[in-house]
């Protein structure tokens, strides 16, 4: 992919956004951050408001926690986009946060004058630091090019389909991750109670069929019972809820989604949601023997809202069975 310097705004300099911003600066892009975050972004320049960012940038990357933060930001970004000199072209808002595909569709409807591309990332904080993220991009082919160009500095961006396709892909990714995290947590409790050396066991498992990036990442925390946060446990509920939205939209009765979401809700209700997701280990250990994780049969349909009709003058949002319209070098 041919890259050249662009003006990029980044909002959300947390565990993921901070190293990503560093890679964007290192790649030679003109990077803007909000003034209160400037101390986290060597080489970037400050702006006072999101509106100012949207009025100047080619791409604004949102790496905020979730949909409520994006709901609050988009009106200001829309104001900034409206102030742009027409000769400079429009700004693309790249949604790097993990949200429901339904949220992306709703924002597309509520802000028709904004160019939206969804670009959630996977690889965790370690992947962000290494610049080796898997980046799942959804949007119109004519609109994803600057996002693919910019995010190449942070990992491997791949255009998967129309607007919303990136969030569907990330939702599927997160179901698998959530299942692994909860399974690891529960298995670790059983193993320790049976007298096994957990460190030795997980090292052995890592070399077998159960081995995974998730296991490698969580093993030190599970062995040490260390729940210092790197990825908040409450995000499991948010992410699995997004997966259930995608499952509902495709007419899929989820087997794992409902129980995982309900387990995550109970963990949050127990006051553990702000700790690392490895805290599922503690939550499992503190529950009574034979206690069911769910009080009732979960709704397999999730919480999705109905998808609105397409607008002929806007990028086509993701819908079940939507075709892929990509150039060969984006595959």
Can you say where each PLM-predicted feature lies in the sequence?
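Hydrophobic residues within alpha-helices
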Residues: 20-24, 107, 190
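NAD(P)-dependent dehydrogenase/reductase Rossmann-like domain
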Residues: 271-331
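Rossmann-fold NAD(P) dinucleotide-binding segment
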Residues: 49-114
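NAD(P)+-binding Rossmann beta1-loop-alpha1 motif at the extreme N-terminus of oxidoreductases
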Residues: 1-61, 125, 153, 158
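Interdomain hinge/lid region at the active-site interface
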Residues: 163, 211, 217-277, 283
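Rossmann-fold dinucleotide-binding core
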Residues: 96-174
